[in-house]
């Protein structure tokens, strides 16, 4: 997973922000995207833990070491597929989740943890930019209807899964 000694060679990098004076004039994204090379380095910081506690720290059970490794190896589309295997809406969670996975990261015991939330966010951004994310329209509608109570991530995920 990642680079064998990436956690030693690469320092943690976080997103930088647009100055407040500029961002109060619009509703655009206020973070500045790191370069793909920098994101790949951050993926390389993943240590290939024997027991990846980031997994259990993630409420969705995302395959974090796997998508970090894919990003490090420049396999962005594969990283997106890995992310979508456990997360219906990473475009939301990459922005809204408080990232308990980072608090559970083993590297965080001695150094700043892997930038998991940032990597997740930009995997999805890359997916939209490259056109890899498309609407999943069912081939045939059954005509049946169902109600999903709740409009949070779980309710939206249930609605998406039931629509397929």
Regions found by a protein language model. Give the residues of each.
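Ferredoxin-type iron-sulfur electron-transfer modules and their immediate structural context
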Residues: 1-145
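N-terminal Rossmann-like FAD-binding beta1-loop-alpha1 element of flavoenzymes
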Residues: 144-164
